[in-house]
Amino acid sequence: MIMSSQQEKKDYDEEQLRLMEEVCIVVDENDVPLRYGTKKECHLMENINKGLLHRAFSMFIFDEQNRLLLQQRAEEKITFPSLWTNTCCSHPLDVAGERGNTLPEAVEGVKNAAQRKLFHELGIQAKYIPKDKFQFLTRIHYLAPSTGAWGEHEIDYILFFKGKVELDINPNEVQAYKYVTMEELKEMFSDPQYGFTPWFKLICEHFMFKWWQDVDHASKFQDTLIHRC
């Protein structure tokens, strides 16, 4: 059942509710754009169970020691609150500069979106993360329920970046962050005190640790496939 506006205002953070009105790119299973849909529409399991699918990205930032920057999502987040995840996970919007019908156009769009959201969530200025240094690797199609009425059903573009960044955390988006080595992340996965987003665990289980071993040559892992997970 879709919750009433009055109930939402009582239960959820005002800023996070506002962001639920942003317009995502609804796609088919081949990542062909069909129309726009609000973030709220795209994340309701009622719609996901009918096949609604949207475009997303997952950014992984590594420092000069090849440590991965993780974030813990804020308690205020409507979907997957307080879970640990990769550096930044969000969506290109159905706006100029972030749309894309062909794969090269779509990759450029998600890079623009990633730069926008890295600033919004982590306060990373564009000068530290030039888009021409973003490495697109592949796309992953997955579905995962969250709590209550919410979930994810995405074609997720994977982006890598290696470099030094300065952070200015937005507490409405992120409650904590840390840099980890591959072994430290594996230890976190086995520690029950940590909870993780399903897409991050899925990416790590199927792809991430192989990519991480050769992060300086990540371009060799690039493909044009959509991996169904």
UniProtKB/Swiss-Prot annotation:
Substrate binds at K39, Q72, K77, S90. Binds 1 Mg(2+) ion per subunit. Mg(2+) binds at H43, H54, E152, E154. GO terms for biological process: dimethylallyl diphosphate biosynthetic process; farnesyl diphosphate biosynthetic process, mevalonate pathway; isopentenyl diphosphate biosynthetic process; sterol biosynthetic process. One of its GO terms (molecular function) is metal ion binding. It catalyses: isopentenyl diphosphate = dimethylallyl diphosphate. It is found in: Cytoplasm; Nucleus. Its EC number is 5.3.3.2. It comes from the Eukaryota. GO terms for cellular component: cytoplasm; cytosol; nucleus. InterPro entries: IsopentenylPP_isomerase_typ1, NUDIX_hydrolase-like_dom_sf, NUDIX_hydrolase_dom. Belongs to the IPP isomerase type 1 family. PANTHER family: ISOPENTENYL-DIPHOSPHATE DELTA-ISOMERASE. Isopentenyl-diphosphate delta-isomerase; part of the second module of ergosterol biosynthesis pathway that includes the middle steps of the pathway. Idi1 catalyzes the 1,3-allylic rearrangement of isopentenyl (IPP) to its highly electrophilic allylic isomer, dimethylallyl diphosphate (DMAPP). The second module is carried out in the vacuole and involves the formation of farnesyl diphosphate, which is also an important intermediate in the biosynthesis of ubiquinone, dolichol, heme and prenylated proteins. NCBIfam families: IPP_isom_1. This is Isopentenyl-diphosphate delta-isomerase.
